[in-house]
Amino acid sequence: MPGREAFYEEAPGEKRTDRIFDETAVVGIQEFASRLQAGITPTFGRWINLKAGIEIPPQIAPQIDAQLDEITNYIFEILHSSNFNQEVHESFMDLAIGTGVMLVNEGTSTNPVVFNSIPLPHVYLNTGPDNRVDCIYRKRNIRLGDLKVLYPDGNFEDIEDKILNDPDVKCTVIEGTMRNYKDPNKEVYDYVVCVKDMEAVILEDTFEGQGSNPFITFRWNKASGEVYGRGPVFNAMSAIKTTNLTI
């Protein structure tokens, strides 16, 4: 994917298409992502419905369904006014390789939910005892002056002088979201943010409850014991290389 960030370092403006002579794989990934989006999360479509479960008594289920229908409408009003459709397409492109990662953050009053497709070179994934992805590390290059905007609840006492004196200097920030298994019956995640260059921890938090992890990771297919998925592009890599060389 020449339009997606690579795993190796590149110079700004460096050409990435000089050795691509056949566009089949490049176009195929775009079509793959578009078809997935059209089939699973169609743009401006209502692709889920909340319904009363089997635990709800049948006599009150219609009333519950009516209320859940209103909630479903509100959910899709938020989704359709957000950047979800754009970001999920990018994540589906990564899924063609094998693994997609999306970050869901709380937004503002005018844009309540913000979605962000995270390129794979920016994250490191690990699995827990149940072989599910429950540990996500993310690396970011951020201006010092933007730290307080991105992490408003952070503690910047140790690096306050550096932020004031050199706000345009970029630093490496590591975010860690790790499942806490002290109580296996509760879904709890420990969240830590540190500035690597200054060895300073600026934020520690805890996410509690089912679905509290802001990172959504999904894999196309995987081999036993592996963390990352294997997508259609990964499996077809030999054919892609051969086709590119024979053009």
Where are these regions (language model features)?
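Secreted/luminal cysteine- and crosslink-motif detector
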Residues: 136, 172, 193-195
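A broad structural signal for short, well-ordered beta-strand segments within beta-sheet-rich domains
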Residues: 171-173, 215
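General secondary-structure edge motif
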Residues: 55, 173-174, 223
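Extended, charged amphipathic alpha-helical segments
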Residues: 185-247
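Extended, helix-rich architectural segments
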Residues: 1-170
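Short, flexible beta-strand-to-coil junctions
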Residues: 95-96, 104-110, 176-185, 194-199
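Generic recognition of flexible, low-complexity loop/linker segments
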Residues: 88-92, 158-164, 174-182, 191, ...
